[in-house]
Design a protein with these regions (language model features):
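Adenosine-phosphate binding glycine-rich loop
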Residues: 133-230
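Rossmann-like adenosine-cofactor binding region
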Residues: 83-169
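Phosphate/diphosphate ligand-binding glycine-rich loop within oxidoreductases
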Residues: 1-32
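N-terminal Rossmann-fold NAD(P) dinucleotide-binding loop
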Residues: 44-45
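NAD(P)-binding Rossmann-fold cofactor-contacting core
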Residues: 53-78
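Short helix-loop-beta connector
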Residues: 27-34, 56, 118-119
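Glycine-rich Rossmann-fold phosphate-binding loop(s) that bind the pyrophosphate
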Residues: 39-41
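Conserved beta-strand elements of the Class I
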Residues: 35-36, 197
Length: 230
């Protein structure tokens, strides 16, 4: 029997952004100034807060296809973040000089191109999780040190990697390793302030379970929630 029932979408949103934050902690440069978030949905919100847990930014630029949604997003969160939130008219201006970039859109075709990315940037690629879809162009994958959350999922679902592989631009050896291997010291992370690093997020079920159990334990310890009979 289950020990708890909770909203899985909220758990997934938080743990996804938390995983990106861990990757950012280990792969991004220590000294950063600008954060760029592409998207205005639930993951954009979660990443806005999670990124600020691991790095201090002087400016955060937000882009989305719908300008009204971008402004609504900024108005909703600007008083909760001690950093200037800026509306970006297009993707190019959003990522200009950005030190950390989070792509959290539903785009099936590339919206982000390598020519716009500064040297030393770190990217969290989150939005696309289907083999034939990608938010970024192949050059970004080729020019970056490419890290993943789970290798098996990457080889089946990471669109930007699989598209580049299908076009014979790279092979599996281009994957630097799983972020867990970097954390454990089994793989090297960033080795210079000029290289571009990418973290591909596809999600791992065990992360959801761990996050849900943490919420359950806290709810139980603080007498929060409702006891029901099944």
């Amino acid at each position: 029997l289950p020990i708890a029932i909770m909203d899985g979408s909220v758990i997934t949103s938080i743990r996804t952004a938390a995983a990106s934050a861990v990757a950012t902690e280990y792969l991004a440069r220590k000294k950063v100034s600008i954060l760029s978030i592409l998207g205005t949905g639930e993951q954009a919100k979660s990443h806005l807060y999670s990124m600020n847990c691991v790095r201090s930014f002087n400016q955060i630029k937000i882009w989305g296809r719908n300008p009204d949604k971008v402004q609504t997003f900024i108005n909703k969160h600007k008083n909760n973040i001690n950093t200037n939130l800026k509306y970006a008219e297009n993707v190019e201006s959003a990522v200009k000089n950005a030190d950390v970039i989070c792509t959290v859109t539903s785009s099936s075709k590339p919206i982000l191109f390598s020519k716009w990315i500064r040297s030393g940037a770190h990217l969290n690629l989150v939005g696309s999780s289907v083999a034939n879809k990608s938010e970024v162009d192949s050059d970004i994958v080729l020019k970056s040190k490419y890290y993943v959350d789970y290798l098996e999922s990457t080889l089946a679902q990471a669109g930007e990697f699989l598209i580049a592989k299908k076009n014979r631009l790279l092979d599996d050896s281009h994957i630097q390793g799983e972020i867990g291997e970097v954390i454990l010291g089994k793989k090297k992370g960033r080795t210079s302030d000029t290289e571009i690093t990418v973290y591909k997020s596809l999600g791992i079920a065990s992360q959801d379970l761990a996050a849900a159990y943490y919420v359950y334990q806290n709810a139980k310890n603080n007498n929060i929630g409702q006891l029901i009979k099944i």
